[in-house]
Amino acid sequence: MTEEAFNPLEELEYQVGTSLPREQLIQKQHAREMELVLSRPVLPGVKEYLEDARQMGLKTGLASSSKCDWVTGHLERLGLIHYFDTIKAADDVQKTKPDPELFNLVVEELGVPAEQVIVFEDSVNGIISAKKAGLFCIWIPNMLTSQLSTDLADLRLDSLNDISLSDLLASVKSQKTNILSRSFKE
């Protein structure tokens, strides 16, 4: 027995007993989704981390499975685009997350050894991609992923406000040192 996927428009038509202007409803839904996306502010701590990274002389890159114009449009709207040394998006690669191609490209463009890279991710596919690229990954779940459970990331933060960038870097350095020393002892 196969079960068909739930279609909310079909269910609504069934409930009201008449057909609905589907295309018009879909357009309204997309417009509302866009309105919600465009009203979202910068997440807490993001701007401070980017400013601190600049002051520390750290290179910053962004890897997104979205289209480049979407990504750069949001970064410009939020006043964050100038913080990034490189930005790579779906248009720049053959395969997006969970494939590591995006992260590999960003790391290559930054000219930083993979073992010195820290990835901040909000999606499970992003975590998988970062780990496949051999990168240290910190998971900061978003509203959609906060209820998920994953042990794939090296560290989880609920918000960048939980810890300063300098304290986080010290913690990550300590954690990496402990991992390396355990590996050599085994």
Name every feature range the model reports, one short phrase each:
Residues M1-M56:
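N-terminal helical cap/lid subdomain that shapes the substrate entry/recognition surface
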Residues E51-Q55, K67-E186:
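Asp-based, Mg2+/Mn2+-dependent phosphohydrolase catalytic module
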